[in-house]
UniProtKB/Swiss-Prot annotation:
PANTHER family: CYTOCHROME B. Heme 1 (or BL or b562) is low-potential and absorbs at about 562 nm, and heme 2 (or BH or b566) is high-potential and absorbs at about 566 nm. InterPro entries: Cyt_b/b6_C (IPR005798), Cyt_b/b6_C_sf (IPR036150), Cyt_b/b6_N (IPR005797), Cytb/b6-like_sf (IPR027387), Cytochrome_b (IPR030689), Cytochrome_b_C_euk/bac (IPR048260), Cytochrome_b_N_euk/bac (IPR048259), Di-haem_cyt_TM (IPR016174). Its main location: mitochondrion. GO terms for biological process: mitochondrial electron transport, ubiquinol to cytochrome c. This is Cytochrome b. It is found in: Mitochondrion inner membrane. The cytochrome bc1 complex contains 11 subunits: 3 respiratory subunits (MT-CYB, CYC1 and UQCRFS1), 2 core proteins (UQCRC1 and UQCRC2) and 6 low-molecular weight proteins (UQCRH/QCR6, UQCRB/QCR7, UQCRQ/QCR8, UQCR10/QCR9, UQCR11/QCR10 and a cleavage product of UQCRFS1). This cytochrome bc1 complex then forms a dimer. It comes from Sminthopsis bindi (Kakadu dunnart). It is a multi-pass membrane protein. One of its GO terms (cellular component) is mitochondrial inner membrane.
């Protein structure tokens, strides 16, 4: 009798995606993050669903409903801590996943790469929308500052900002719609992730060498299911350690105070995973210029495939490109640090230099390094 997983219409899809999928024999732990992101998404949807059962999206009761979840709901404190810190784990995996793609040249699967940038944007939108529902001071002022950026758009900006707010400022209508967006967008992300996988399985996975290894493929199960399970163990270890021992370490203390439109916090900043983009936004003295730089910081990912000049796909054997990549990684950490600092010297100039150093390797230095490495590999005799 033929195995059911190979004949059943639904089982067949799962089989071709996770069991009999031909995978390169040499993919490293850097290829774990796709499955970890899937797990993170499931954790966020499940914990979010239970939080939504007890949350009320009204300006008068939102803050106290979150306190009620933590105090009175069975394991509500744990569900909330897992949800809040799960977002941090989600972004950590996302950044490492994108970094892996850049380092090993995975972006040359253009459709897979581009359909991956779209969920990245959607995750960022979801996380921003999710920062508003607790209705603390930083929730309110973060929403005010970021949505205010829309007013920088010429001609339609102010109208657009007021349309998003549902009034003349961030208020009850804004909170309700942001909660609605935050609830629905994870399901959109799940659909986009399936499309991302669909395109990936058209070509098969890349591997550290960047070479096509058609003759040397192994089945995904049991080799990579076990490997992914190990990655999941580490993910859960870090997430549970954060949620149980230090749940508020990545949050902002201002968010323990209820939202007050009459009292501005001394330093408005988003969650840590947006700080790099926030630093780029603040480094431009012009409002519209800052918004464009903010968008460009993510949109540059879309043009990376067209800036690839090297004859080799992966950076594994390209030391000059490797150096530039790690400069970029260190620079992202610098931007994250700057985004959390007040707007004063020397942080302003450091932020401006770091912003220039963010775009330079991607747009100029890496393509030039690729050409230089091609030249160095050419036989000179």
């Amino acid at each position: 009798m033929i195995n059911l997983r190979k004949t059943h219409p639904l089982m067949k899809i799962i089989n071709h995606s996770f069991i009999d999928l031909p995978a390169p024999s040499n993919i490293s732990a850097w290829w774990n993050f796709g499955s970890l992101l899937g797990i993170c998404l499931m954790i966020q949807i499940l914990t979010g669903l239970f939080l939504a059962m007890h949350y009320t999206s009204d300006t008068l009761t939102a803050f106290s409903s979150v306190a009620h979840i933590c105090r009175d709901v069975n394991y509500g404190w744990l569900i909330r801590n897992l949800h809040a810190n799960g977002a941090s784990m989600f972004f950590m995996c996302l950044f490492l996943h994108v970094g892996r793609g850049i380092y090993y040249g995975s972006y040359l699967y253009k459709e897979t790469w581009n359909i991956g940038v779209i969920p990245l944007f959607t995750v960022m939108a979801t996380a921003f929308a999710g920062y508003v529902p607790p209705w603390g001071q930083m929730s309110f002022w973060g929403a005010t500052v970021i949505t205010n950026l829309l007013s920088a758009i010429p001609y339609i900006g102010t109208t657009l900002a007021e349309w998003i707010w549902g009034g003349f400022s961030v208020d009850k209508a804004t909170l309700t719609r942001f909660f609605a967006f935050h609830f629905i967008l994870p399901f959109v992300i799940a659909a986009l992730a399936i499309v991302h996988l669909l395109f990936l399985h058209e070509t098969g996975s890349n591997n550290p060498s960047g070479l096509t290894l058609t003759a040397d493929k192994i089945p995904f199960h049991p080799y990579y299911t076990i490997k992914d399970a190990l990655g999941l163990t580490f993910l859960l270890l870090i997430l549970l350690s954060l949620a149980l021992f230090s749940p508020d370490s990545l949050g902002d203390p201002d968010n323990f105070s209820p939202a007050n439109p009459l009292n501005t916090p001394p330093h408005i900043k988003p969650e840590w995973y947006f700080l790099f983009a926030y630093a780029i936004l603040r480094s431009i003295p012009n409002k519209l210029g800052g918004v464009l730089a903010l968008l460009a910081s993510i949109l540059t990912l879309l043009i990376i495939p067209y800036l690839h000049t090297a004859n080799q796909r992966s950076m594994m054997f390209r030391p000059v490109s490797q150096t530039l990549f790690w400069i970029l990684a260190a620079n992202l950490m610098t931007l994250t640090w700057i985004g959390g600092q007040p707007v004063e010297q020397p942080f302003i100039i450091i932020g401006q230099l770091a912003s220039i150093l963010y775009f330079m390797p991607i747009l100029m230095l890496m393509p030039l390094a690729g050409l230089f490495e091609n030249y160095m590999l050419e036989p000179k005799w």
